[in-house]
Design a protein with these regions (language model features):
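Conserved beta-strand/loop scaffold segments within soluble protein domains that form the structured core
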Residues: 1-181, 191-196
């Protein structure tokens, strides 16, 4: 578990990259529950890139953000789960300042018997813009759920959510297989491109 707190001052810019990977001999459960708090002052901006590619058996990833006037936050999350792994991502952003904006994009792939849940809450408390998007590829016997929530407390708050869960299209596989790839190689190529 870890707690990361960012207090980004007026007109300051931060880019934070977080990559999680677990490995070991399989005798213990690899659990990672990071919490990230972001407090953006007037005109501040932050890009948060969070990637979890493999090896984490169980994770609860929480991101909480408050945005002041003209602050901007961009979150890019990429998650791959396999086996019986479980990944939960929770995002809450309070857009408190006029002109603030938040863009959350999560791209995930769930394989085997793994499970994933994505939840995002955008609270538009001022004239602001917010967008949350979750795109997931589901394979094998995996389970994926997405629950975006938008709350506007200002008539000039513009909030959008998008969620898509689906399998790899057969025609995509066929096209790559006609180029000489095996079905497994074609799947790997598609997953790699999706998470890029």
């Amino acid at each position: 578990d870890g707690l990361h707190r960012f207090f980004v001052g007026k007109n300051a810019k931060v880019r934070y990259v977080e990559k999680h990977y677990g490995e070991g001999d399989g005798r213990g459960k690899r659990v990672m529950n990071p919490t990230t708090e972001v407090h953006l002052e007037e005109g501040a901006s932050m890009i948060l890139e969070a990637t979890q590619i493999s090896g984490i058996d169980d994770t609860l990833r929480k991101t909480i953000a408050t945005l002041a006037e003209n602050a901007t936050l961009e979150v890019q999350e990429k998650v791959l789960t396999t086996g019986e792994q479980n990944a939960v991502s929770e995002f809450v952003a309070d857009l408190n300042g006029a002109g603030s904006s938040c863009n959350i994009v999560s791209r995930t792939v769930a394989r085997d018997k793994s499970t994933q849940h994505f939840s995002s809450t955008l609270n538009g408390n001022a004239a602001c813009s917010g967008h949350t998007e979750c795109d997931s590829i589901i394979m094998d016997s995996a389970k994926v759920s997405a629950s975006p929530q938008l709350t506007a407390a200002n008539v000039d708050a513009s909030l959008i959510h998008e969620a898509a869960i689906g399998k790899i299209a057969g025609e995509q596989l066929l096209k790559l297989m006609t180029l000489g790839l095996t079905e497994q190689e074609a799947e790997e190529r598609i997953v790699s491109g999706f998470l890029k």
